[in-house]
Amino acid sequence: YAVTSVGTYNEATGSVDFAEDDTAYNWGYNPYNWNTPESRYVQNMENGSDATDQMREMISAFHEKGIAVIMDVVYNHTAGTGNGSIYDMTAPKYFYRMDSQGNYSNGSGCGNEVATNHAMVKNYVIDSLKHWMKDYHINGFRFDLMGLHETSTMKENYEALYEIDPNVMVYGEPWAGGTSQVQKGCSTSNINDASPDGTV
């Protein structure tokens, strides 16, 4: 394990704020807010800035050891919808893809999928990525279910990050968790393997 002044690598995983009461089976893949560190990993929480301060300290400690920090990000779905989503409460149903009956599309297999094809959602994701890179000095991003993001959106994400750091690393899972409208016509970027084992 890589050890820092704020803990080990294993303690650092799942650092984005996620909504989950039962943490017995959760790796932080139910994001509630994309832009805040998960406060449950904070040591001796005394004020609201402890989560951000300790995360920055941890990343700095990794960098001092020559270790790049790749953040596992989940921009393909959120922990909830409606009153369970800060995004739905801000702009009802705008942040999510809807099916032809007006229901939440579920290409993530988690109850919803984020509409990165909507201009303001795409801009918000780019701003979020830039926030993590500029304010926390993240070196790269691994996208969960990247197959739910349009190729053009991923290109724009990369270009925005490349402007900050030409050495940025961006990669992700080239599949979705279910059937999605975004996958139509993108067979070259998706895997049709029922149980991907990391080989393509």
Tell me the role of every PLM-derived stretch:
Residues 1-136, 153-165, 169:
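Substrate-binding/active-site clefts of carbohydrate-active enzymes
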Residues 29, 139, 145-200:
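Active-site-proximal helices and loops of the catalytic beta/alpha 8
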